[in-house]
Curated annotation (Swiss-Prot):
Protein's name according to its UniProt entry: Cortistatin
Record's subcellular location: Secreted
Protein family membership: Belongs to the somatostatin family.
Keywords from the named record: Cleavage on pair of basic residues, Disulfide bond, Hormone, Secreted, Signal
Pfam families for the chain: Somatostatin (PF03002)
Tissue: Expressed in a subset of GABAergic cells in the cortex and hippocampus.
Organism of provenance: Homo sapiens (Human)
Bridged cysteine pairs (disulfide): 93-104
Gene Ontology CC annotations of this record: extracellular region; extracellular space; synapse
Main location per the UniProt record: secreted
Length: 105
């Protein structure tokens, strides 16, 4: 399933917004630095994963067809277009409703 650019932007903005929220109680000193570092690592990991996933889905959707799918596409491209029925040629006019409407093609 390809990830649309709009959805990717929404996910990234959500990750940025939650990483920027202050914590309740406000830890101070070394704990605060550690929490900020952990949040930065999580944010970086999430962004790396989303970039990898977007690249992977883009390659998967543009990848070549293999096996049965390739044969089916080749058969459809090489084959003659489907023939229209000869019944239309024999019966060009048809009454749809009694005494009201007829269609001639």
């Amino acid at each position: 399933m390809p990830l649309s650019p709009g959805l990717l932007l929404l996910l990234l903005s959500g990750a940025t917004a939650t990483a920027a929220l202050p914590l309740e109680g406000g830890p101070t000193g070394r704990d605060s630095e550690h929490m900020q570092e952990a949040a930065g690592i999580r944010k970086s990991s999430l962004l790396t994963f989303l970039a990898w996933w977007f690249e992977w889905t883009s390659q998967a959707s543009a990848g070549p067809l293999i096996g049965e799918e390739a044969r089916e596409v080749a058969r459809r491209q090489e084959g003659a277009p489907p023939q229209q029925s000869a019944r239309r040629d024999r019966m060009p006019c048809r009454n749809f409703f009694w005494k009201t409407f007829s269609s001639c093609k």
